[in-house]
Amino acid sequence: MWKNFKLNKFLLFIPLTSLMFCFNSPKNDDEKMQTIMVSVKNTLSYLHYSPKPINDAYSKDVYKHYFEMIDPGKRYFLQSDMNEFAKHETKLDDYINQGDLQFYKLTIDRLYQRVDEIDKITQEIFSKPINLEEDETLTLESKLKKVPADQKEQYNEWKKFIKYNILQEIESMNSKEEAQKEKKDSVQKFKLKDTIKLEILSPQQKLTKATDEVKDLVKETFTRFKKRKKMDWFSVYMNAYTEVFDPHTNYYSPKDKEDFDTQFKGKVIGIGAIIQEKKGNLYLGALTIGAPAWKSKKLSEGDKILKVKSKPKEDHVNVVGMLSDEAVRLIRGEKGTPVTLTVQKKDKTIVEVTMIREEVAIEDTFAKSIIVNSPNGKKYGFINLPSFNADFEDEKGRNASDDIKNEIIKLKAQNIEGIVLDLRNNGGGSLTEVGDIMGLFMNAGPYVQVKDGNGKIQTLKNKQETPIWTGPLVIMQNEISASASEILAGVMQDYGRAIIVGSPQSYGKGTVQTFVDLNRFLNSEDDFGSLKLTIQKFYRITGESNQRKGIVSDIQMKDFFTYAEIGERYDDFALAWDKIPSATFQKLSYFDVKALEKASNDRMAKNANYQLLLESAQWREQLDKEETITLNINKFNDLMKHRKSQIEKFKKLTKFDNGLKFEMYPAEIEREKKDEVFKKKSEMWIKNLRKDSYLQEAMNIVADMKAKV
């Protein structure tokens, strides 16, 4: 299930300080977890938009949800474990009321015990020849799986799981082999100078190589699991309690909250390097141009990280074998402070590099635009907005509305005639940014209504009087467009200011969250983490909720997500849809939606690439519904051949070109000459845009709007 959890700043002024829980300062981890349990329960009961009674029915829901989270594939626990755990099924309400850890400790201790046992089981499986000639099947659908009755059954299930992964590895080798053959044939056919070295492995060699690959993967999985501290599972346990209230109410440990803030702000204080984990070691990934790691001229992608010195007066910390997220926290720190990395270069030399931490922007978080030269000779603008980012701690920090404004100004300087704003895959963000972005396209007016748990309704208004773009506007969305994306698309649709194009409906998240710092309620200096809490529901200015139903596109174009179970309506604990009175607003008469829809539908009916996309999506849906798969290599190969015959006709999709010509800004063209990484990213972005059939039609629609179809 796709879930998009985004912070909304709105209504952080709610008087939470009036709520106070008194506890003595915890002396150990157990006392800390007990304090968190009771604090979370009290916060949920007092402040959640729609608090649930903490009773046996609630306990049963938490119990079921918990095991779906910690053992979704039913591979770890035995039926004897589940029989023992079942005695607690109606007691979890009592445990959270009392801060009782017995069930949490019982299940997590047992989980680690079973992991140790299964580690040995898999070693035994790999110590014997793998027979892929047996006529067996593996159940893929977790809902149809049964918990293993005993260790013998568990052994057999893991053996099947390993066989399946080996078969997939062999199939991957076969596909690469076929691709090499095709490339070599092309070289010979066209008498090219390229030399293609063809590596053909025997079936036994493939089996041996695939088995070794899967063995290493399984070993690394268990190694990583055992490195994880038991207390790290406490967040999972607490979220079993919180998510039964609604899927967007979540407990965040201090480090989880730090990660959330980093992503939301679109910046991090560090050295500007990706940290990658491979077979128990940590390596430097891509370096951000202009960031400390890049500026050092001593570090490179692929360097093995041996030690980190986080502060001048602290010792070097050996990070070999450490989890990547732990090492990242050593490398990050306060702006302007030094950090030292000891790395092993590819030539085995050891280098120690000291850098000063800086603010590094996460560029993929921010809006970006490009000029589109259409086949009709007109220029249009395309703006992609990945999230409604905002930095509430820094007034000078970047935010989505300022970024969009800057992109519009750049596009207007190029004399564009229409704009396509892409909100596909945008999971939301700051509610206040929605109003500010709306104000860039139209005059002041209400943009959303919010209702709290007491039924109080408030209408939020955009106060910007003068828009900077009043021309044709298309907004693209899909099933993953959620929350703030849905508010913006909904209000622009309600006013008639923009045409909404894309999936039949968006995600359907119609709730507002805020972060509650648990420390503020407790008389302690310890960090207890935070609770992201649903405190309101939001409604369109028409009074209709976005909850579950989402935003229905004016012009619908189905995609791969259309056929998947994505959206709020598929979550068991999602709040219900409802309606409140409409706000007062005046609808604009910008475009003839029906005429635009007809023109688009006529084009898409004749668009061979779009029709093939739909066929491919429907075929993938059928694959997703398959409940079992054969583990016999001959039958598996036959199945793969059949699938490849289906895939063959979809290969045209990879060669599609929408005919649009994309043009970078003059300043970006100059930057490409100096910044190779930026150049490669730009080239890849344009390459993907040229394969976008949906963008092609969005540009057709914005052209129709300009022509007043």
Locations of the language-model features?
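Conserved functional hotspot residues or short segments at active or partner-binding sites
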Residues: 125, 141-143, 156, 160, ...
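Polar, glycine-rich mid-to-C-terminal structural blocks
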Residues: 484, 496, 501-566
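Extended, domain-scale alpha-helical bundle/helix-rich regions
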Residues: 121-270, 274-279, 676
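Acidic/histidine-rich, surface-exposed loop or edge segments in extracytoplasmic proteins
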Residues: 37-49, 87-91, 216-220, 386-389, ...
